[in-house]
Protein backbone atom coordinates (compact mmCIF):
# COMPACT_ATOMS: atom_id res chain seq x y z
CA UNK A 1 0.00 0.00 0.00
CA UNK A 2 1.34 3.45 -0.89
CA UNK A 3 2.22 5.88 1.85
CA UNK A 4 1.00 9.47 1.85
CA UNK A 5 3.07 12.61 1.51
CA UNK A 6 3.16 15.30 4.17
CA UNK A 7 5.64 17.98 3.09
CA UNK A 8 5.69 21.73 3.61
CA UNK A 9 8.16 24.19 2.09
CA UNK A 10 8.17 27.79 3.31
CA UNK A 11 10.30 30.87 2.69
CA UNK A 12 9.47 33.73 4.99
CA UNK A 13 10.54 36.06 7.76
CA UNK A 14 10.50 35.46 11.50
CA UNK A 15 7.91 37.51 13.36
CA UNK A 16 9.62 37.06 16.72
CA UNK A 17 12.87 35.90 18.25
CA UNK A 18 13.08 32.12 18.62
CA UNK A 19 11.82 30.57 21.86
CA UNK A 20 14.14 27.70 22.80
CA UNK A 21 13.47 25.28 25.64
CA UNK A 22 15.15 22.01 26.56
CA UNK A 23 13.61 18.70 27.55
CA UNK A 24 14.84 16.86 30.65
CA UNK A 25 16.90 14.70 28.30
CA UNK A 26 18.62 17.85 26.99
CA UNK A 27 16.97 18.01 23.55
CA UNK A 28 16.35 21.55 22.23
CA UNK A 29 12.85 22.54 21.12
CA UNK A 30 12.71 25.91 19.35
CA UNK A 31 9.49 27.59 18.25
CA UNK A 32 9.15 30.52 15.85
CA UNK A 33 6.41 32.34 13.99
CA UNK A 34 7.15 32.55 10.26
CA UNK A 35 5.35 35.01 7.98
CA UNK A 36 4.86 34.27 4.29
CA UNK A 37 3.38 36.84 1.94
CA UNK A 38 1.72 36.14 -1.38
CA UNK A 39 0.34 38.45 -4.04
CA UNK A 40 -2.72 37.93 -6.18
CA UNK A 41 -4.99 40.05 -8.30
CA UNK A 42 -8.56 40.76 -7.29
CA UNK A 43 -11.52 41.05 -9.68
CA UNK A 44 -10.59 44.62 -10.55
CA UNK A 45 -7.00 43.67 -11.41
CA UNK A 46 -5.50 45.28 -8.30
CA UNK A 47 -2.69 43.47 -6.50
CA UNK A 48 -3.74 42.13 -3.13
CA UNK A 49 -1.13 41.10 -0.56
CA UNK A 50 -1.92 38.34 1.91
CA UNK A 51 0.29 37.40 4.84
CA UNK A 52 0.00 34.00 6.51
CA UNK A 53 1.57 33.18 9.87
CA UNK A 54 2.97 29.69 10.45
CA UNK A 55 4.05 28.11 13.73
CA UNK A 56 7.32 26.28 13.10
CA UNK A 57 9.00 23.91 15.56
CA UNK A 58 12.64 22.77 15.37
CA UNK A 59 13.91 19.80 17.41
CA UNK A 60 17.37 18.61 18.46
CA UNK A 61 20.49 20.08 16.88
CA UNK A 62 18.37 21.95 14.35
CA UNK A 63 16.54 23.55 17.28
CA UNK A 64 19.83 24.62 18.84
CA UNK A 65 21.00 26.18 15.57
CA UNK A 66 17.68 27.96 14.99
CA UNK A 67 17.66 29.31 18.53
CA UNK A 68 21.21 30.58 18.30
CA UNK A 69 21.31 32.12 14.83
CA UNK A 70 17.77 33.15 13.88
CA UNK A 71 16.35 36.49 15.00
CA UNK A 72 13.16 38.47 14.46
CA UNK A 73 13.08 39.55 10.81
CA UNK A 74 15.48 36.81 9.64
CA UNK A 75 14.59 35.33 6.27
CA UNK A 76 14.63 31.54 6.30
CA UNK A 77 13.80 28.57 4.08
CA UNK A 78 12.11 25.73 6.00
CA UNK A 79 11.14 22.22 4.94
CA UNK A 80 9.06 20.07 7.21
CA UNK A 81 5.69 18.44 7.74
CA UNK A 82 2.34 19.49 9.13
CA UNK A 83 1.39 18.22 12.53
CA UNK A 84 -2.02 18.64 14.13
CA UNK A 85 -2.17 18.35 17.90
CA UNK A 86 -5.05 18.25 20.35
CA UNK A 87 -4.46 19.13 23.98
CA UNK A 88 -6.30 20.30 27.07
CA UNK A 89 -5.54 23.87 28.07
CA UNK A 90 -5.11 25.13 31.62
CA UNK A 91 -8.77 26.14 31.57
CA UNK A 92 -9.80 22.52 30.90
CA UNK A 93 -10.94 23.21 27.34
CA UNK A 94 -9.70 21.01 24.49
CA UNK A 95 -7.60 23.01 22.06
CA UNK A 96 -6.14 22.28 18.65
CA UNK A 97 -2.92 23.47 17.09
CA UNK A 98 -1.30 23.19 13.69
CA UNK A 99 2.49 23.29 13.58
CA UNK A 100 5.13 22.75 10.94
CA UNK A 101 7.77 20.38 12.31
CA UNK A 102 10.93 21.43 10.50
CA UNK A 103 13.45 18.87 9.34
CA UNK A 104 15.55 21.20 7.19
CA UNK A 105 16.41 24.89 7.37
CA UNK A 106 18.37 27.32 5.21
CA UNK A 107 19.20 30.76 6.56
CA UNK A 108 18.81 33.36 3.82
CA UNK A 109 19.77 37.00 3.48
CA UNK A 110 23.00 38.75 4.38
CA UNK A 111 24.76 38.86 7.72
CA UNK A 112 22.84 41.95 8.78
CA UNK A 113 19.57 40.12 8.12
CA UNK A 114 20.28 37.20 10.43
CA UNK A 115 21.56 34.74 7.85
CA UNK A 116 24.86 34.09 6.24
CA UNK A 117 28.13 32.59 7.21
CA UNK A 118 31.15 33.94 8.97
CA UNK A 119 29.88 33.47 12.51
CA UNK A 120 32.24 31.83 14.93
CA UNK A 121 31.73 28.99 17.36
CA UNK A 122 31.28 25.35 16.50
CA UNK A 123 28.97 26.11 13.61
CA UNK A 124 30.03 24.21 10.49
CA UNK A 125 30.80 26.49 7.59
CA UNK A 126 29.07 26.04 4.28
CA UNK A 127 29.71 27.71 0.99
CA UNK A 128 27.02 29.94 -0.45
CA UNK A 129 24.24 28.12 -2.26
CA UNK A 130 23.99 28.14 -6.03
CA UNK A 131 22.05 31.12 -7.24
CA UNK A 132 19.57 30.92 -10.03
CA UNK A 133 19.03 33.99 -12.11
CA UNK A 134 20.50 37.30 -11.03
CA UNK A 135 22.88 38.30 -8.28
CA UNK A 136 22.06 38.93 -4.65
CA UNK A 137 24.07 37.67 -1.75
CA UNK A 138 22.53 34.72 -0.04
CA UNK A 139 24.53 33.52 2.91
CA UNK A 140 25.21 29.92 3.84
CA UNK A 141 23.87 27.93 6.72
CA UNK A 142 21.83 24.98 5.48
CA UNK A 143 21.05 22.40 8.11
CA UNK A 144 18.97 19.26 8.17
CA UNK A 145 17.78 16.92 10.85
CA UNK A 146 15.44 17.55 13.74
CA UNK A 147 12.65 15.03 13.34
CA UNK A 148 11.51 15.34 16.92
CA UNK A 149 11.51 11.83 18.25
CA UNK A 150 13.58 9.75 20.59
CA UNK A 151 15.89 12.55 21.73
CA UNK A 152 18.20 12.00 18.80
CA UNK A 153 21.03 14.43 18.26
CA UNK A 154 20.94 15.63 14.67
CA UNK A 155 24.15 16.63 12.96
CA UNK A 156 24.28 19.59 10.60
CA UNK A 157 23.82 18.65 6.98
CA UNK A 158 26.96 18.75 4.95
CA UNK A 159 26.87 20.16 1.47
CA UNK A 160 27.55 17.61 -1.20
CA UNK A 161 30.21 18.65 -3.70
CA UNK A 162 28.83 19.83 -7.00
CA UNK A 163 29.12 17.25 -9.73
CA UNK A 164 31.31 18.31 -12.60
CA UNK A 165 29.59 18.01 -15.94
CA UNK A 166 31.52 18.16 -19.16
CA UNK A 167 30.25 20.24 -22.03
CA UNK A 168 28.14 18.36 -24.56
CA UNK A 169 30.08 17.20 -27.61
CA UNK A 170 30.11 19.56 -30.57
CA UNK A 171 28.35 18.36 -33.70
CA UNK A 172 30.31 18.32 -36.94
CA UNK A 173 28.23 20.60 -39.11
CA UNK A 174 28.63 24.13 -40.38
CA UNK A 175 26.20 26.96 -39.73
CA UNK A 176 25.34 26.85 -43.44
CA UNK A 177 23.77 23.40 -42.94
CA UNK A 178 21.04 24.81 -40.66
CA UNK A 179 17.75 25.00 -42.63
CA UNK A 180 16.58 28.37 -41.29
Swiss-Prot record:
InterPro entries: NA-bd_OB-fold, Primosome_PriB/ssb, ssDNA-bd
Gene Ontology MF terms in the entry: single-stranded DNA binding
GO cellular component, one term: nucleoid
Residue ranges occupied by any SSB domain in the UniProt entry: 5-109
Annotated spans, Disordered: 107-180
Biased composition (Gly residues): 109-121, 132-152
Name of one Pfam family that matches: SSB
Residue stretches of biased makeup (Low complexity): 157-169
UniProt xrefs under SUPFAM superfamilies: Nucleic acid-binding proteins
Function description: Plays an important role in DNA replication, recombination and repair. Binds to ssDNA and to an array of partner proteins to recruit them to their sites of action during DNA metabolism.
The protein's name: Single-stranded DNA-binding protein
